[in-house]
Amino acid sequence: MADKFEFTAKEREETIALIDHLRSTIGATLQPKDEEKLRVRLANSLTYNQVHRDVFGLNPILSGLQTAKIVVEEIGLKRDAVLAILLHPSVEDGFMTIEEVRSEFGESPARILHGLLRISELYKKNPVVESENFRNLLLSFAEDMRVILIMIADRVRLMRQIKDNTNDEARHEVSQEAAYLYAPLAHKLGLYKLKSELEDLSLK
């Protein structure tokens, strides 16, 4: 059995700060029971040991909150994107269905999550992603442009976090994708600041 997932003291502090920040930033767009339902879902995922660190040792709940902060502050998305980001690990790992998301949070977050799952399937079928053909496939599979915006934000978040990580092989792979896939997508969508940051971080 896998070790029980635990937050470090620093992660707990940052998580609380990010939740407070997101609440103050997008609170007006949240529906009455959004936060309560999300808290229950995340608490259950911890209780049933459904949360695991990624290949870089990063905390997925904290990573989701960091990505959510980027999509809110640097791209301008709000409630539906944030909910989709925070629920994505549970849905991707099979602990929650798209139908449950639709029932609890509405059609819009469910639509974004459906697009994110389609992209995951596309990745599994295409080991080589550094091509214009794959970028075009990505755009068509996403269905909703918010999916691509979230993916760009998540890659920016990951690149910021792993610049000093010792897993050189995984870091190199992520950097290659940032330079050849996500930076061109960011440019195409007019996210020039994020595009430049992706290019800069991919060289480090």
Where are these regions (language model features)?
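Active-site helical microenvironments for divalent-metal-assisted chemistry
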Residues: 1-204
